[in-house]
A protein has these predicted regions:
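Cationic, amphipathic, low-complexity segments that mediate targeting or membrane/lipid association
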Residues: 11-21
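Cytosolic covalent-transfer regions centered on His/Cys nucleophiles
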Residues: 19, 23-199
């Protein structure tokens, strides 16, 4: 089901949040309890949903459809999707309703669908920035794709909000773009999340 977006202005970017019908949270479905099974009561972390196999760096793409296709492929190859074609269609339908280029060279496409098996993220940095019809008009070089199962209650919005919070910091985004390996990319995120948890 495509989501309808609303915008919340922040100091650096206009962050796209989806309404409550399009969010994923950790209550209710088995997917929602994926971290409870590990006895983990800490707040959700981006690194819980992102692994090196779903990070691609300095990718060369012609447009946002190619970037989304590449990220869907990573989700599919790592067993996160029931139907990659259906999920990609869902993401593109959501994109047609309003750009997920949130500003500052960042885009957060997303889709909630029964084509998704488990909540997951994929991420890419681009060798050359692409036009994304972003809210601030800036071309995009950093993308995160959020995948949510249809039955996952509000996880979608939680992940959007968490990503938006982290990506508001220009230096953080620059560190991600400069990462030379997927492991380094994830380490940048983990370091930032650990710093916030320690506050």
């Amino acid at each position: 089901k495509p989501c309808r977006g609303v915008c919340l202005k922040t100091k650096r970017m206009a962050v796209v949040f989806v309404k409550t019908g399009c969010i994923f949270g950790f209550s209710g479905s088995p997917q929602d309890r994926m971290f409870e099974a590990k006895g983990d009561s800490r707040p959700m972390q981006i690194t819980d949903l992102l692994v090196p196999e779903r990070v691609a760096l300095n990718m060369q793409v012609a447009d946002k459809a190619m970037a989304i296709h590449a990220m869907v492929g990573m989700l599919d190859r790592t067993g996160c999707l029931r139907d990659a074609v259906e999920y990609e269609k869902n993401v593109l339908e959501r994109e047609a309703q309003g750009t997920t280029g949130v500003g500052g060279g960042v885009a957060i496409p997303h889709g909630k669908s029964n084509a998704v098996l488990v909540p997951a993220l994929a991420a890419v940095t681009l060798r050359e920035a692409i036009d994304y019809q972003a809210l601030d008009g800036a071309p995009v070089r950093l993308l995160f794709l959020i995948a949510a199962p249809d039955g996952a209650n509000d996880l979608h919005i939680q992940v959007l909000a968490r990503l938006a919070q982290l990506l508001m910091e220009p230096m953080f985004c620059e560190e991600l773009k400069q990462a030379s390996t997927p492991e380094e990319f994830l380490a940048v995120i983990a370091k930032r999340e650990q710093g916030e948890t320690a506050r």
